[in-house]
A protein has these predicted regions:
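Phosphodiester-processing cores and adjacent nucleic acid-binding clamps
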Residues: 1-128
């Protein structure tokens, strides 16, 4: 079985708490060098680099899967900064659209220091 790093961040992951200054193309080049066939992008609370990542992956002939690292809280309407991290990787275009909506709601309605996801919304997602 091939190893693929599905949890990583790039230079656009989080403006407030940057994890890295590595750019998408550097990751993709290295993935190709290692013989990987898939590149995952999972930035903090956003899908900020999805178009750049897809373009670069196409250039290098590697599959691109988009995900997010989300912040789960029991009730995002409460002003409590505690949260649990979760990686969400949709496997279909339909699922990707649903994750985008989930993430939009987290940013619009659940934002308190970070875009927080409603547990109910997460549980309502299809298994795809």
């Amino acid at each position: 079985m091939e190893y693929c790093n599905y949890h990583k961040h790039d230079h656009v992951s989080s403006i407030t708490t940057p994890d890295t200054n590595i750019r998408c193309e550097e990751y993709v080049k290295r993935a190709v060098e290692l013989g990987h066939t898939t590149y995952f992008t999972t930035n903090h609370g956003n899908g900020g680099d999805i178009f750049e990542a897809k373009t670069i992956c196409d250039k290098y002939g590697i599959r691109c899967l988009f995900g997010i690292e989300g912040y789960i809280v029991p009730n995002p309407l409460e002003k409590d900064s505690r949260n649990y991290h979760i990686i969400i990787i949709p496997t279909t275009n339909k699922a990707r659209r649903k994750v985008n909506l989930l993430n939009s709601r987290a940013n619009e309605e659940g934002f308190y220091y970070k875009p927080r996801i409603f547990v109910e919304d997460l549980l309502a997602l299809d298994k795809d």
